[in-house]
């Protein structure tokens, strides 16, 4: 007889195809709803293309997995269950579009960011970049509304649906606060940025909506009580931070790759745990060099090479790798000592392993 974890693994292997089909149909079926005329039509096409771009779909898959782990019995093909999962993917796209405007990024999933798509449609007119950014912000807001409406329109029991919406909106507020932290910490010298502030930013900006939201919402829709939802959220926090450190390390290895001057958090002046660890473990003269390179914000090969040398010299990569593994172990210990059933614990391990496998080379986007 197959174990619950084995059955979950098999079901999750089938889930991406089910979700991708539902995602494509969702935008096809909503074409008339968003038929706002000639000016908006190409934006809806771009919106559809952006959301349906090939991605890992970590958030919807975690929601589906959590729903099953905690006893939900609807099939993964159930329309309302898929709508709940889709709400997280729409939320993710809303966040990415706004994030790309803030960072002035040009590529997302190896294709143009949304504001660059709009800019390209406008052609060579004065202010195309500004208009592209403005339109992208508004389209992001529309996706936010779509996300809320998609979750609201599920046929779960009203009490469950209302509770899910309440959690969902709280996660959005947390993400916004994390974005503010990211922006404001980016204006500070690395010497004035505390590790605790970076960890808080990671938790608010990404961990809550990427890991806690799907797992808690899936469990909630399966009927899990508030005490166990709080326990689940506490359990997820070190896992989420570990995955964010993994993202830092992946990006650093990409930073050291062939395209050394492409946009990265390091060159954009973002304050990461990797940079803070490097600063903490350098001697004073090297700290000054690191501060100088980070303050220039110029993507020239000399500054890039110096940052790389200083990070390597500090041993920060090894330190962060150790911290990441320690956080994963902390979560495992907490899971083993939790009040969840053996089957639920095994299911959560399977979910964490799935995410780790899918993100070990390219992160969580």
Where are these regions (language model features)?
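All-alpha prenyltransferase/terpene-synthase fold signal
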Residues: 1-365
């Amino acid at each position: 007889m197959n174990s619950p974890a084995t059955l979950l693994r098999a079901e999750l292997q089938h889930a991406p195809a089910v979700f991708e089909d539902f995602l494509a149909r969702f935008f096809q079926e909503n074409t008339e709803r968003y038929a706002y005329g000639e000016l908006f039509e190409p934006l809806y096409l771009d919106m559809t293309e952006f959301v349906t771009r090939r991605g890992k779909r970590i958030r919807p898959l975690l929601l589906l997995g959590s729903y099953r782990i905690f006893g939900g019995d609807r099939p993964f093909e159930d329309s309302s269950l898929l709508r709940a999962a889709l709400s997280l993917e729409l939320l993710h796209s809303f966040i990415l579009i706004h994030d790309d405007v803030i960072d002035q990024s040009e590529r997302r999933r190896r294709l143009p960011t949304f504001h660059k798509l709009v800019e390209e449609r406008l052609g060579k007119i004065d202010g195309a970049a500004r208009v592209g950014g403005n339109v992208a912000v508004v389209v992001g807001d529309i996706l936010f509304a779509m996300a809320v409406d998609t979750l609201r329109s599920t046929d779960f029991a009203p009490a469950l649906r209302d509770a899910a919406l309440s959690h969902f909106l709280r996660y959005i507020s947390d993400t916004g606060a994390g974005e503010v932290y990211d922006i404001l910490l980016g204006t500070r010298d690395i010497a004035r940025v505390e590790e605790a502030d970076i960890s808080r930013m990671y938790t608010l900006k990404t961990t809550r909506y990427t890991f806690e939201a799907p797992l808690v919402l899936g469990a909630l829709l399966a009927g899990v009580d508030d005490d166990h939802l709080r326990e689940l959220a506490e359990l997820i926090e070190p896992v989420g931070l570990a995955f964010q450190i993994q993202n830092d390390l992946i990006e650093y290895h990409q930073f050291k790759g062939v395209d050394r001057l492409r946009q990265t958090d390091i060159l954009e002046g973002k304050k990461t745990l990797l940079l803070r660890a490097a600063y903490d473990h350098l001697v004073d003269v090297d700290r000054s060099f690191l501060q100088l390179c980070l303050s220039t914000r110029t993507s020239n090969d000399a500054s890039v090479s110096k940052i790389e040398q200083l990070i390597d010299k500090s041993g920060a990569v090894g330190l962060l790798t150790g911290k990441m593994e320690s956080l994963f172990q902390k979560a495992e210990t907490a899971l083993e000592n939790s009040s969840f059933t053996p089957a639920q614990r095994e299911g959560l391990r399977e979910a964490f392993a799935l995410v780790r496998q899918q993100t070990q080379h390219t992160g969580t986007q």
